[in-house]
Amino acid sequence: MSRVALVTGGMGGLGEAVCIKLAALGFKVVTTYSPGNAKVKDWLQGMNNLGYGFKAYPCDVTDFDSARECIDTVTKDVGPVDVLVNNAGITRDMTFKKMTKADWDAVIHTNLDSVFNMTKQVLDGMTERRWGRIINVGSVNGQKGAFGQTNYSAAKAGMHGFTK
């Protein structure tokens, strides 16, 4: 029986590379996408034409109920999540002086709240099965900070604390 790995933000960049590596290691790979993402069909077809067999599910990782619904659907369709990779992330880079509350909230909700929302849905099952892995993709900016990335650095620092 192969294990199920779910990667948030798996449709590009680092997330896509993680999906490919997990597939190479024998995992059934599932990724999430933001509802309304017009690129998902083409991306999924391209990846599956290469033989990966990925599945993709809509999930607003910033919303606890959406995360729960997503994990419930994945569990029914593919199986329980054994590996969760919290990779979803965005930036809204600008000086703090120019940053709006909406800019702050968007980054904190996507980069930090999502870690709680997704982890909360899978942890009990992993504990019951006595096997599971949760990987939180951080950034050095969470430790050192970066000009123009107050919100991003704060979110990644929060993720670091959450993980510890």
Predicted segments, located by residue:
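The beta1-alpha1 cofactor-binding region of Rossmann-like NAD(H)/NADP(H)-dependent oxidoreductases
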Residues: N37-A38, P58-E69, K101
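Conserved glycine-rich cofactor-binding loop
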Residues: M11-G12
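Active-site loop immediately N-terminal to the catalytic Tyr-X3-Lys motif
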Residues: K97, K144-T150
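Conserved glycine-rich Rossmann-like NAD(P)H-binding loop of the short-chain dehydrogenase/reductase
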Residues: L25-K41
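Residue(s) in the substrate-gating loop at a strand-loop-helix junction
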Residues: S139
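Active-site helix of classical SDR
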Residues: T119, A155, T163
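Substrate-binding pocket helix/loop in short-chain dehydrogenase/reductase
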Residues: T95-F96, D103-I108
